[in-house]
Amino acid sequence: MRWLGHASFYLETPAGVRLVTDPYGPQVSPAAPVVTADVVTISHEHFDHNYLDNIKGNPVIWRGLTPEGDWAKIDVNCKDIHAYTVPTYHDDAAGAKRGKNAVFVLEIGNLRLAHLGDLGHVLNDEQIEKIGRIDVLMIPVGGYFTINATQAWQVVEALKPRVVLPMHYLVPGMQGFPIAGVDEFTAGRANVRRFGEGQIDLKAENLPQETEVWVLAASQPRI
């Protein structure tokens, strides 16, 4: 698994499925990654989450929203991946400011991952129940367009994942995003690990029993 920057991750499953979440393009960073994928998930239809020109191959696209901007009903399988979506909003005003957002839950073998997209509010009890047990949580922490660091910790405490992968925060090279860096999220926390290489190998038996934050270096490869 690699963090490609912003809200985009690259995963390769044991069955060889290459999945990319929320791809972005040069409007976000001139060094936007070019990757080959079998599956692409898109949490919502904003330019920094649905840029497909840098995705090679002939991937299946799982879009969390319909062309009309409503939630799509995603409950699909691709080899060893089962994916479903949970309806949420891009803001704290029931979508009045920025529309709707889809959380993607990915079941891969005995691992459960959740990609929160551009979540704009803390989760309610129904959403928490639908998301369910999560091993690895990909969560926005930069604020402004999404939940901020304080709200992100509320979500973490509600879901109780084993690993938290912060995303959607300011990094060098980003263009025109008034969002905070990751340090606001990690400040004062002892359970933080930093990975310089931007790539991790996820196995259920190797994950911590208590929640840890894993900060990945953004990897912008050509793969």
Indicate residue ranges for each PLM-predicted region.
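Active-site-proximal loop/helix segments of hydrolase catalytic cores
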Residues: 89-159, 170
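Binuclear metal-ion centers of metallo-dependent hydrolases, dominated by the metallo-beta-lactamase
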Residues: 72, 98, 163-223
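Zn-dependent metallo-beta-lactamase
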Residues: 1-14, 18, 66-67, 206-208, ...
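Conserved acidic residues
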Residues: 37-38, 135, 162
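Active-site environment of divalent metal-dependent phosphoester hydrolases
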Residues: 26-30, 45-51, 121-124, 144-150, ...
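Active-site-proximal beta-strand elements of phosphoester/diester hydrolases
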Residues: 1-3, 18-22, 80-89, 105, ...
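Pre-active-site segment of Zn-dependent metallo-hydrolases
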Residues: 8-71, 84-101, 119-130
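Active-site beta-strand termini and strand-to-loop segments that position acidic
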Residues: 11-14, 76-79, 106-109
